[in-house]
């Protein structure tokens, strides 16, 4: 910030400056495909609500303990027959804890008004001692904040839709409570969220 302020001041004073040296270059690549699917039975805004069971805080005694594992499914239909497998990429966002690779949990109850709930989670108080973890069905953590290849989210095969030259897919994952490394788990209602994108081969 100081360097930028200095350069601006020098330009206003009419001092000629040489172009600044670069330390490196970041090359960003990507691919957009026209092979798309439709999410089955979405709620407004494609919001999927996962209700974790009510558990005792004694189930989360030690750092890394996971409890209340709950499966959730994302169903896709009308996919091209050329698509063999699909998986999800969980997008980084305000709820991402880049240290633990889990989702921050907030002391706020879920309610029907999703637009209000998702407006600004950090404006509410973060829960102590506990976060929410996303996992594959084998229980292995899907690390939040990582690149898509490094999340290692499981991919699933599709099935042909009856009477149509299209496929359907059901993607299965787990969510659960996880004990943080520090702080006692407090008894409270919790809410978090994460955006996702479907990854096409």
Swiss-Prot record:
InterPro entries: Adhesion_dom_fimbrial_sf, Adhesion_dom_sf, Bact_Fimbrial_Adh_Pro, FimA-like. Belongs to the fimbrial protein family. Gene3D superfamilies: Fimbrial-type adhesion domain (2.60.40.1090). The keyword Disulfide bond applies. GO terms for biological process: cell adhesion involved in single-species biofilm formation. This is Fimbrial protein FimX. Residues 1-21 form the signal peptide. It comes from Bordetella pertussis (strain Tohama I / ATCC BAA-589 / NCTC 13251). Disulfide bonds join 37-79. Its main location: other. Keywords: Disulfide bond, Fimbrium, Signal. It is found in: Fimbrium. GO terms for cellular component: pilus. Bordetella pertussis is the causative agent of whooping cough. An essential step in the disease process is the attachment of the bacteria to the ciliated epithelium of the respiratory tract, enabling the organism to resist normal host-clearance mechanisms. It is unclear which bacterial cell surface component are responsible for adherence but the fimbriae of B.pertussis are prime candidates for being involved in this process. The gene is fimX. Pfam families: FimA. The keyword Nucleotidyltransferase does not apply.
């Amino acid at each position: 910030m100081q360097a930028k302020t200095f350069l601006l001041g020098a330009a206003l004073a009419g001092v000629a400056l040489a172009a600044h040296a670069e330390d490196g270059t970041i090359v960003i690549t990507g691919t957009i495909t026209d092979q798309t699917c439709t999410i089955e039975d979405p709620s407004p805004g494609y919001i999927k609500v996962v209700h974790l069971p009510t558990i005792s805080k004694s189930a989360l005694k030690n750092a890394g303990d996971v409890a209340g594992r709950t499966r959730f499914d994302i169903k896709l239909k009308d996919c091209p027959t050329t698509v063999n497998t699909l998986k999800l990429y969980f997008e980084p966002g305000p709820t991402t804890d880049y240290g633990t690779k889990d989702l921050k949990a907030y002391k706020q109850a879920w309610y029907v008004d999703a637009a209000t709930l998702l407006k600004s989670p950090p404006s509410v108080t973060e829960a102590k001692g506990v976060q929410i973890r996303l996992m594959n069905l084998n229980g292995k953590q899907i690390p939040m904040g990582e690149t898509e290849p490094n999340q290692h989210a499981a991919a699933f095969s599709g099935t042909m839709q009856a009477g149509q030259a299209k496929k359907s897919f059901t993607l299965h994952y787990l969510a659960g409570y996880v004990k943080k490394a520090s702080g006692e788990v407090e008894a409270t209602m919790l809410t978090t969220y994460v955006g996702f994108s479907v990854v096409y081969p």
